[in-house]
Regions:
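Active-site pocket-lining/capping segments in soluble small-molecule metabolic enzymes
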Residues: 1-22, 40-102
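Conserved nucleotide-cofactor-binding alpha/beta core module
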Residues: 24-26
Length: 102
């Protein structure tokens, strides 16, 4: 999608957010090569993982992360409980947080 956006002439910022599951330092280089300007790290990463990933961040690629908010019991974008139970897709920003129900 990033390459298609650039090929279509889009010149704005291209961000890969938490649902891209960029959990390995090498994934940042791939994101940069694909044309990303910013990567938003998954919430599930430990502080040590964030340090390791940020140390490998290529020049010109911005890193961002959330430090507050709901923490999913699954890796971001990998859970289908909400969609299966309620038809609401977490991948479309509409998670019902069904995993938190009693």
């Amino acid at each position: 999608m990033l390459a298609l956006a650039r090929q279509a002439g889009y010149e704005g910022g291209l961000f890969l957010s938490t649902l891209a599951n960029l959990t390995h330092p090498a994934s940042l280089l791939a994101a940069k090569e694909l044309g990303a300007d910013r990567v938003i790290l998954p919430r599930e990463l430990s502080i040590d993982e964030v340090k390791q990933i940020s140390a490998a961040c290529p020049e010109g690629l911005d890193l961002e992360m959330f430090i507050h908010g709901a923490l999913c019991v699954a890796y971001s974008g990998q859970c289908n409980i909400s969609h299966a139970q309620t038809g609401r897709s977490a991948n479309r920003g509409d998670c019902s947080q069904a995993c938190r129900l009693p």
